[in-house]
């Protein structure tokens, strides 16, 4: 039997490349919306694979955490050293409704605060808000020179530092436990808690650069769509939220 080439078998041509498919054709874009406690609600866009068969795109988006500079949310460069984390809780059409997930300082800002000849005071506490969010709050402060001080250094005694730390924890517990998560966000932006700590510790030690360094979300209550829609202004499409003033005050209802 003669053995030769089988002409029925097609041979691939040299130099023929596989067809390149753009991966972005299988993806779709969604708009991320911040809560109305921030001035600018339009955070940005994110993408995910399109819904196919039993795979729903919304399931992959829920729980996604995005990090945004607070300066972009507030429209002011004064907040450029702080980062806010927002968590996607609900998908409405092409809009992703988010909730507050945490706040932190940038690394360069933290390093710029630490200097020689002063004492560092740090405190942290785990607190539950009035709407059952469990948060861990981290505060930071530094000693400063008194008005008539001649000595170069401002190191503090350990007993004084313990008193200051105790006072910091008391103030953080009081300020956080009596407000909701949305009200706490409005307090964190203008540094209300830091100013309260500075005022209360003047008799113990003169302090400077007092900040809530970090807020970490540990536990959240069962998801409530009504509360989230109220936080976003009943699902409104407005790009602007409420501006937080520097002199934030809790709303006190008058007795009927």
UniProtKB/Swiss-Prot annotation:
GO terms for biological process: translation. It holds the Pfam family Ribosomal_S3Ae. It is found in: Cytoplasm. Keywords: Acetylation, Cytoplasm, Ribonucleoprotein, Ribosomal protein. SMART domains: Ribosomal_S3Ae. The modification N-acetylalanine is found at residue 2. GO terms for cellular component: cytosolic small ribosomal subunit. Component of the small ribosomal subunit. Mature ribosomes consist of a small (40S) and a large (60S) subunit. The 40S subunit contains about 33 different proteins and 1 molecule of RNA (18S). The 60S subunit contains about 49 different proteins and 3 molecules of RNA (25S, 5.8S and 5S). Belongs to the eukaryotic ribosomal protein eS1 family. This is Small ribosomal subunit protein eS1B. The gene is RPS1B.
